[in-house]
């Protein structure tokens, strides 16, 4: 009689193990949730919009309602052919910094910096690896290169470095799907070059 109960119990137990091991779970063995590429990109789009990447990395068009993002050049950074007036560095004595009228360039005690092209073009982050993106944000390295110069103000990388790995992955995934905008942003200028 005991054998009659043991055989079905063994079969049910074995089948349970097979079903559990073959089941499609939404988490990896490390416990991370698996997310589709589409969901990752959507999350990245949301994050890019709420943290204000467009504020500095997208040129603006002035309208009768104020300025709007120039969608033709979205994420292109400071346009290489944008005319720039001479910066009045004397106002920095009073503790001020200066911004270009489209917010893609700033002048301060560090000199003049230009917002980077973060579009998917090769002149932007098109050829970057995820590792480079993480290094740029986490370590404040230009172009995410180990030997790169430090990112300059006003880029708040020291705040963004606290974002989670999944959030940075999502932002990178979204930016890699953005419209490629060819634009070689000028290099920074020292304060001495501005005088």
Regions found by a protein language model. Give the residues of each.
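Electrostatic cytochrome c docking/interface patches
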Residues: 28-49, 61-65, 84-86
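Detector for the c-type heme attachment site
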Residues: 56-62, 138, 156, 176-177
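The canonical Cys-X-X-Cys-His
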Residues: 44, 50-60, 133, 171, ...
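Electron-transfer interface patches adjacent to heme c in soluble/periplasmic c-type cytochromes
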Residues: 73-134, 158-168
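Extended, well-folded interaction surfaces typified by the phenylalanyl-tRNA synthetase beta subunit core
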Residues: 184-187
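Bacterial N-terminal signal peptides that target proteins for export
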Residues: 1-11
């Amino acid at each position: 009689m005991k054998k009659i109960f043991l055989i079905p119990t063994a079969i049910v137990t074995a089948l349970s193990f097979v079903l559990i091991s073959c089941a499609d779970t939404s988490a990896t063995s490390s416990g991370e949730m698996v997310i589709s590429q589409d969901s990752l990109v959507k999350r990245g789009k949301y994050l890019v919009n709420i943290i204000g990447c467009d504020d500095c990395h997208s040129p603006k068009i002035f309208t009768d309602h104020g300025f709007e993002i120039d969608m033709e050049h979205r994420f292109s950074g400071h346009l290489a052919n944008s005319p720039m007036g001479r910066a009045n560095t004397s106002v920095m004595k009073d503790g001020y910094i200066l911004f270009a009228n489209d917010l893609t360039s700033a002048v301060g005690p560090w000199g003049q910096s230009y917002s980077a092209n973060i579009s998917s073009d090769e002149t932007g982050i098109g050829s970057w690896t995820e590792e480079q993106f993480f290094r740029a944000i986490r370590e404040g390295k230009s172009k995410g290169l180990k030997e790169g110069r430090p990112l300059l103000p006003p880029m708040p990388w020291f705040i963004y470095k606290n974002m989670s790995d999944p959030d940075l992955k999502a932002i990178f995934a979204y930016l890699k799907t953005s419209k490629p905008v060819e634009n070689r942003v000028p290099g920074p200028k020292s304060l001495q070059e501005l005088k």
